[in-house]
C-alpha cells in the first residue's frame, strides 16, 4: 500500500492488483479518508465500475470537453485506483483511529477556538502580539488581553475570557496574568486539531466548577455566552428553555447533570456538511474542480485572443451599443471639424475652433441621449412588449446614463478649454486684416475677455458649467450614499435628497442650452442652429413620462392595509392593489408620502406576487427620507397600540397618504426565461427574489388545485416550467428572517417535490465548526429534529452559518444541471456583484452549464 502521506486529500486510492496473482482473483476497491494526520477506511467494495458510473463519468467528461480553440482538454486521472485481492473484513480499528470517519469529524471539522490558524505559523504572530501587549507589564499577559493576543475580535471578548478561565483551571492558575510559557501551553491546546482535545477544552469551558459534570445552569450560561458571541438575541432570551431541552435529551435518568460522553453524543448527532457539497458524486466533483482550476496560457497572443473572445461572447450586446455610440460621436466630431476647417474662422483661430465646434456637436448628441435611459415607462414597455431585450441591454440603462454623463463632462471640458485658452486669445491678438472676416460675428475686435463673457453665449455657458458641476458632484456615489461626512450645515449636501433636488437643476441647464444654441458663435442661419433639433424628442418624451407619473399616481388611489416594523429597521407597507395595476415579479415601483416630502419618489421592489390581492414593499431605514417615513408610520395608532408593530387600516384619522407609480421593468422580471434559477439576495436585497418565489408558490397552488379538480393547468408560469430554483438569502441579523417567515414556513410545508431550495445564511454567526458557534449548531439540530423549527430563523427552513462558498454553490448547480442555461439574479451590496458575475463567466466558459448573471439596478 502506498504511503498515505503522499496524498493530501480524501480521494479514492487504487492501483493495479498484484500481477503475480491470477487474473481470476476478485478485486475490491478500498476507499480511504485521509485528513490531517489520521486515516480511516470508509468502504470496501467491488473494484469494477458499474455501467451507470462509467456512463456518468463519460457524460461529464463530454460535457466538460471544450473545443480546441478554447485550449482545453478532457480531465484525466480523476483518482488512482488500487486493486487488492479479496480479504475478510478486519475488526474495527481503535477508537482514536476511527474518529476521522465518525460524524464527530464532520461535526468538529474546523471546531477551532481560533479561526483559520494552526499551531505552527500562527504562534509566531501570537508571540509578536504578546510582546506588544506586555511591553509595560513585566512580560505578563493580563486576562483581559488574552482574546486580543490570540486573534479573537472584540465581539468575542466574553467568549475569550471564558476560554482563558477554562485553560487556567485545568492548570491550577489562579492569578489573572500568564507568562509567555503559559501562553504557549494555552496555544498548543486550543490549536490542537485532535477531536478529543477540542472536545475536552469545550467541556472545560462549560464545566466551571471543574467537577466533571454539567448542570442545567452551566449549560444555560454557555448558551447565553455562545448566543451573545454570535449576536443571536432571541436565543439569549430563550436560553433557559434550550438548556432544559439539552438536559431532557441527554439526562434521560434525570440525575440533574450530564457527563463528557453525553456531550460527545450530542456532537455526533449534529454532523455538519459544507454547503454545496451535499449530494455531489465525489468523482464528478473532483473532475469539475480540476477543470475549473486556473490555468495560465503561455502563448501571449493565444491568451489575448481567448480573453477577447470570451469578453465579446459575454458582453456582445453592450459592445455593439457602445461601438455604435462611439462611432456616431466620432462621425459628428469629424463632420464639424472638417466643416470649420473650410471656413474663414480657421484662418484666425486654427484647429482650436474645429475642436471646440466638434466637441459642441457631440455635446448636443449626449445631452439628448442622456435622457433616454431614465425614461422608465418607455424602457418597461420596450422590455415587456418587444423582442428588443434580446439585442439591447436594458438592464444597463442606469450604467449607460452614467457613462454618457462622463462623456458630457469630457465634452464640456474640451469645448470650454478650446474657446477660453485658444480661440478667444487668438481673436484678441489677431491683426486687423486677419480679424476683419470675424466682424460679422463678433463686431469690432475686442480688447479683453469681458467682451466674450458678458454676452448671452458667455453668461449662459458659465451658468451651465456651474450648475452641471454641482449636479455631477452631488450625484457621485460618495455624496449620494452619504459616505462623506461634512460638518453642519454642509451635511445637507450629502445623501439622496441632495442628489434628487440637484438633478432638477437640469431644467435650468436645458433651458440655457437651447438659448446657448440659438445665440452660438459663427452661425447665423436658423436651420444650422441644430441644438433644439437634437433635444426636442428626448425632452418631449421625458416630460411626458413625468406628467404621466403625476397623473397616474393621482388617479390610482391606494389604501394602506397593514404596517409593520421589523427587527433590522425594516418597514413593511401592505396596500390595496389599484385596478389595472398589472406587474411581474421582480419589478419595482416608486413610493411617495406627502407627509414626508411632497416631491420625493423612491423606488422599492414589489415583494407581493402578481396573484396576490394586495401590493407590498419592504423598506430598509437607511437614509433621511426613509427615517422620516418610519417616524410618520410609527406614531401611536388611534387605538393606542404601538405603531412600530401595528396592523391597522387606512381609515384611521391620522394615517399618512401614500402614492405609488409603476410598475417598472427590472432584470429580475426575466426569470421565466429559465428552467433553472439561482436567486441571491443580501439583506433587504431579498425583496425582488421573494416576489419571484411567491409567484412560483402561488402557481404551484394553482396547479395542485387544478390537478385536484382533474383539469388541465391554465397557468403558463407555473411550477412545471421550472426544474429547480435555488434561493440564497444572506443576512447579518437574526431578526431579518421575521420579514418573510410566513412564506418560508409555507414553502417548507408545500414544496414536496423539492423544486425550490431555500438556503438561509446568518453571517453574524461564526462559521460552522467554530467553537463560538458549536453549541448553537447542536441546539439547532436537536430543536429542528424534535420540533421542526430552526432556532436561528424561527422557521422550518434550517439556517446556515457565516457566508456561502459561492464557488461550491455554482459547482453543485453545474453538476446537477449539465447542458442547462441557469438564470442568476442578484440584488444587494455591490461587493458581491463582481464575485458572482466572475463565477458565472468562469463556469460558463469551462463547463456545459451556462450561467446568465443579472444584477438589480434601479
From Swiss-Prot:
InterPro entries: Cyt_b245_heavy_chain (IPR000778), EF-hand-dom_pair (IPR011992), EF_Hand_1_Ca_BS (IPR018247), EF_hand_dom (IPR002048), FAD-bd_8 (IPR013112), FAD-bd_FR_type (IPR017927), Fe3_Rdtase_TM_dom (IPR013130), Fe_red_NAD-bd_6 (IPR013121). Residues 1-318, 373-397, 476-497, 697-858 are cytoplasmic. Residues 548-670 form the FAD-binding FR-type domain. Its EC number is 1.11.1.-, 1.6.3.-. Keywords: Calcium, FAD, Flavoprotein, Membrane, Metal-binding, NADP, Oxidoreductase, Peroxidase, Phosphoprotein, Repeat, Transmembrane, Transmembrane helix. It holds the Pfam family FAD_binding_8. Residues 340-351, 419-454, 519-675 are extracellular. Coiled coil: none annotated. GO terms for molecular function: calcium ion binding; NAD(P)H oxidase H2O2-forming activity; peroxidase activity. CDD domains: EFh, NOX_Duox_like_FAD_NADP. GO terms for cellular component: plasma membrane. The keyword Lipid biosynthesis does not apply. Phosphorylated by CPK. Residues 1-13 have a biased composition (Basic and acidic residues). Belongs to the RBOH (TC 5.B.1.3) family. Calcium-dependent NADPH oxidase that generates superoxide. May be responsible for the oxidative burst in response to pathogen attack in the leaves. Monomer and homodimer. This is Respiratory burst oxidase homolog protein D.
